[in-house]
Amino acid sequence: MMTQAQTYFYDGSDVALLNGQYTDVFSLLGMHCINEGKALVVRCFLRNAQKVDVISLKDGRKVASLERVNEAGLFAGTLGRRVKPFLYALRVVYPLCELDIIDPYQFGSLLDSQDLYLFGEGGSEQAYRFLGANWRQVDSVEGVHFCVWAPNAKRVSVVGDFNHWDDTRHVMRQHMANGLWEIFLPDVAEGAHYKFDLVYQNGERHAKSDPMATQMECAPNNASIVPKKHQHPWADTQWMDKRATTAWHRAAMSIYEVQLGSWRRKGEFGEQYFDYQDLIEQLIPYVKEQGFTHIELMPVSEYPFDGSWGYQPVGLYAPTHRFGDANGLKAFIDACHQAEIGVLLDWVAAHFPKDPHGLVRFDGTCLYEHEDPRKGTHPDWDTLIYNYDRGEVRSFLLSNACYWLREFHLDGLRLDAVSSMLYLDYSREPGQWLPNAYGGRENLEAIHFLQMLNQRLYQAFPGICMIAEESTAFAGVTKPTDCGGLGFGFKWNMGWMNDSLSYLGRDPIYRQYHHNQLTFSLMYAYSEQFMLSISHDEVVHGKGSLLHKIPGDDWQKFATLRAYYGFMWGHPGKKLLFMGSEFAQRDEWNHNHSLDWHLLAFEPHQGVQRWLRDLNQLYRQFPALSVLDYESQGFRWLDCDNGRDSIFSFVRYGEGSDVPLVFVVNMTPTLHQGFRIGLPQGGDFCEYLNSDSHLYGGSNQGNAGKVIAEDLPWQGMASSALITVPPLGCLILGPATDAPRDTSL
């Protein structure tokens, strides 16, 4: 015979609930009106419970005791004469303890219809505010709102420390129209570990990390972590206000690329990472002293495999645990801003790894990726490619970009592997790729996504820099979106990098035959807003360090590297240099070890470091080196054809009264005395910098700091002078004048 409590369940609903097959749990569990609103019933499912009472949250009084429906843990009961719903807790007696639990099934949906619309359409900039785990207060009750997108799952539960990882304890509410699942849990603590337990259509169960988690466990564990309530108090208003009005394409930008795990380490054997406080105390003063304007962080989103350097992230919203928590990262960025140093972040939106706890077949289907491997799999890295055609995927990525810029006050993003996003046949042979709707090779969905991304980010975050690592000749990468471009602010100049490093590796005897490798970049320098980048990719995987690439003895190696840096800092375009290159690291980069800081005990390495510092100082002081980077009138060759001597000479111009600077770069070990060079005006010229000075470890050949112009036309200039050009050296000359202003922010 059926008990009274059993009558409170629909036919078979209790059995379906126990078997994990009842997905519409909010219609069954919790408090509900019955008998046409004349009574209230409370139903709950609590494994191992012996007794359950209903307690009013308003006054703490017991309202009713629930009847046990069966031994599995189903309880139900009416609440006497009460007919109006109220907030309540369940006082649960277990064999070893008694707990008061605020029933999550008494709360309605917390999702906003406008948020849901924008998420589905691909235009949500703050999806992380309602997806993932967010602290909320509902009717004076504080708790965590969990929400996940899994439209093809049969059932989704949140499991964690707070429910002993029981997948039947907190089954989530399903929103059929948009594929979201949600639940509000009051009894959850900061730092609690959790996952989403999904039942696929084929009956398989899989525990997945939260795609929107803002904190994750240390590898090899992979649970998501409920965030802290307290957030970092920002003190960078002055920087943010200045940034908003800065035109970076006209400003000095000298970027120091850093992999936080290997810049420096601590511990007896260098086995411990620096935490963010260590980095605040050591990295920021170092970057400031060296004169860099920005730090570019290699990816800091959580990644399980150290060898990926962060370029295969699983927790796109979670700062990696390796160096501290989110507040620690915010404190580091805040300290950078207070030291007038910008912070850029490498951001990976081109692909994601196949780790089973991540996005791969998230709800049993190819939700974030393409079903067809000819579009969905990256052949080079065996990773998966985002389906940019799905609105929810676009919202996931757009919101993530906004998350880093808004919540962490980052000053821009450098998008990795953009070329692989733009082309459907990237690294694929014929027959291994699918053409677009027009029969072409361009990935139209990815192109539209990048255009939308840049347009939205520049509008929402004034003064940021969006940078593309794009290695092909795709037209319009930095062209505005309203003119058909992708809308990036800058593009890495991969052509200049490849040509110049190839030239650098040649014996000086043969450089005369490859002179165009250093001059060709000026043929296309104004086709995009280029950034000259010597990144981590150039000093790893057997490529050797920059110093190692250069032929000759040690003196020639160091002299050549100094001259190369001088040419780079004089060339139009913003600058980026990977850590360690500023003091001529001898070994190629190894992510498992600190940089070789002990090398700074030796004068040649100190000399390169001083040279970079002084180049940065000069770069920031003279507007001619940055203000017209992307306008042809800012650069003029004096002589680009002197291949016989491998000497390059040119002038950098600014605007109006800006002081012009003359660069003379000699890439052979031959000393040239009485070498005539054209000058942009008459009078005295200062030898502002000479890479061959003994201060930098050179042979001290030069012009004693001063050059006097003659009224003798030369190289298209009205004036000229006879100068000494040092071997493997770079001279930077300018009219004698007071030092101009700092052109950085």
Swiss-Prot record:
**Keyword Lipid metabolism appears in the UniProt entry:** no
What InterPro entries does the record tag this protein with?
A: A-amylase/branching_C, Branching_enzy, GlgB, GlgB_N, GlgB_N_E_set_prok, Glyco_hydro_13_cat_dom, Glyco_hydro_13_N, Glyco_hydro_b
Please provide, alphabetically and separated by semicolons, the GO molecular function terms listed in this UniProt record: 1,4-alpha-glucan branching enzyme activity; cation binding; hydrolase activity, hydrolyzing O-glycosyl compounds
- Reactions catalysed according to its record: Transfers a segment of a (1->4)-alpha-D-glucan chain to a primary hydroxy group in a similar glucan chain
Catalytic residues (positions): D416, E469
Does the keyword Acyltransferase belong to this entry?
A: no
Pathway noted in the entry? Glycan biosynthesis; glycogen biosynthesis
GO biological process, alphabetically ordered: glycogen biosynthetic process
Which EC number applies? 2.4.1.18
- Output a single Gene Ontology CC term carried by this record: cytosol
Q: What role is this protein assigned? A: Catalyzes the formation of the alpha-1,6-glucosidic linkages in glycogen by scission of a 1,4-alpha-linked oligosaccharide from growing alpha-1,4-glucan chains and the subsequent attachment of the oligosaccharide to the alpha-1,6 position.
Q: What is this protein called?
A: 1,4-alpha-glucan branching enzyme GlgB
Q: Which organism is it from?
A: Shewanella sp. (strain MR-7)
